Amino acid sequence: MKAKLLVLLCALSATDADTICIGYHANNSTDTVDTVLEKNVTVTHSVNLLEDNHNGKLCKLKGIAPLQLGKCSIAGWILGNPECESLFSKKSWSYIAETPNSENGTCYPGYFADYEELREQLSSVSSFERFEIFPKESSWPKHNVTKGVTAACSHKGKSSFYRNLLWLTEKNGSYPNLSKSYVNNKEKEVLVLWGVHHPSNIEDQKTIYRKENAYVSVVSSHYNRRFTPEIAKRPKVRNQEGRINYYWTLLEPGDTIIFEANGNLIAPWYAFALSRGFGSGIITSNASMDECDAKCQTPQGAINSSLPFQNVHPVTIGECPKYVRSTKLRMVTGLRNIPSIQSRGLFGAIAGFIEGGWTGMIDGWYGYHHQNEQGSGYAADQKSTQNAINGITNKVNSIIEKMNTQFTAVGKEFNKLEKRMENLNKKVDDGFLDIWTYNAELLVLLENERTLDFHDSNVKNLYEKVKSQLKNNAKEIGNGCFEFYHKCNNECMESVKNGTYDYPKYSEESKLNREKIDGVKLESMGVYQILAIYSTVASSLVLLVSLGAISFWMCSNGSLQCRICI
């Protein structure tokens, strides 16, 4: 019996064996990502794909200043509203910035035909040449070119008129028929603007044009229209009962435009030879101009970012990330960040069998921790770590490139559709944005899932690599660890890590230690059986004595009557 108790004590007080564990890196990162199956997974490393910051300013784009219209609208600028004279010196720009409620537009009330289409055309123009298409003094010798002014277009307290148009009126009591043509020799598209006056009464018609019935005809190879003034009393706008309707056309190089009229023509004075540039545009913004330079401009402010997506604003000019409605697009590049809990011990489930990562391993993603008589320490597996880094880096770069290529192509297609259809329905725009957002989010979710699975697989592969080397020279003790059946010094540990472990060298020692441990287990089982019997008998005796004592006490105080019948 004494021998058996001695064996039990030996089993309970066995010394710590040499161990090696497979694990992964952990740190103090609080980055979280979403996957297809999980939300807010904490990871060691990740990259943000969504830009949500701007500077709140209007900036130059690649060193080129925008054309800031200030209090003028596109209409006021291009027609030549007298209050917009300061803009006439601007010959080129990176984009056009217009305020939401511009004061100076069409100073004389009337309808601007195809105004939205004109804005669309000007949005792709980065510079123009403003030139006299019909010089004021020499083009209209039989008509008055100075009396056509109005208080509605006053400038510095005096009646005036548009700086790019001429209001032709009677001269010396007559308004002769006119015919004027222009041949576009600019080798560029030329924007030509004109107007047709609609008086409020016949008296004004006779006074200004000396006839009751008049017409205006404008003809080119792509434009053919005849206008008849509509004389009618109208509500006053800017103290005017009359109206001027404004028209425009684009004249191709070599094409000719012909104006014929016998009254009511608001003639072109200046025209514009257009130079189109990729990346120009028109934005409506209250942001102020600043001395800054950027690659991307939105109505909210400038963005300086190389990220593929942004949620600042759907309207962008320049080299901009694609707009999506997402609030978070973060792609994982590292591992699940689950630092090991001290109460569980050092090792401890990224791959399903390891409970936590190691903050002590800082030079790699996957690696080892060993413990022997010479001490303990961490060592990263550089090969598997570097292969993983290369693979994930290439994948992230490829995905970003695919995202940019995909959405840029879609963006170009929509721009073409906008010109053909003139206006995209807002619901259609919203639908496309939803598709872009869904595609971006789904792609990130799928790739995050794949990356985390990839890390799991790498840890498992490292574990299987060690297991296949050690075979039965060590036993699996859980949490990614192995306990050696033999002494394993630092040289031995290094051989396991680099894949050169000599299994036969340690087989005999392992076999002997394994047999000893198995013997101890068998002896221990016998001892445990004896202890179990003793424990059962002792417990029964204690129970019987307790019951007897209680019965005696109850009989003595009359709570329990005992009768013996013979």
Swiss-Prot record:
Gene3D superfamilies xrefs: 3.90.20.10, 3.90.209.20, Hemagglutinin Chain A, Domain 2
Signal peptide start-end: 1-17
Family the UniProt entry places it in: Belongs to the influenza viruses hemagglutinin family.
Topology with respect to the bilayer: Single-pass type I membrane protein
Stretches in topological domain Cytoplasmic: 551-566
Extracellular side: 18-529
TM spans (from-to): 530-550
GO cellular component assignments: host cell plasma membrane; membrane; viral envelope; virion membrane
GO biological process: clathrin-dependent endocytosis of virus by host cell; fusion of virus membrane with host endosome membrane; fusion of virus membrane with host plasma membrane; viral budding from plasma membrane; virion attachment to host cell
Annotated lipid attachment (S-palmitoyl cysteine): 555, 562, 565
Residue(s) at site: Cleavage: 344-345
Name of the protein this chain belongs to: Hemagglutinin
PTM entry text: Palmitoylated. In natural infection, inactive HA is matured into HA1 and HA2 outside the cell by one or more trypsin-like, arginine-specific endoprotease secreted by the bronchial epithelial cells. One identified protease that may be involved in this process is secreted in lungs by club cells.
SUPFAM superfamilies xrefs: Influenza hemagglutinin (stalk), Viral protein domain
Annotated InterPro entries: Capsid_hemagglutn, Hemagglutn_HA1_a/b_dom_sf, Hemagglutn_influenz_A, Hemagglutn_influenz_A/B
Keyword match Signal: yes
Record: glycosylation sites: 27-28, 40, 104, 144, 172, 177, 286, 304, 498
Molecular function terms from GO: host cell surface receptor binding
Misc. remarks from the entry: Major glycoprotein, comprises over 80% of the envelope proteins present in virus particle.
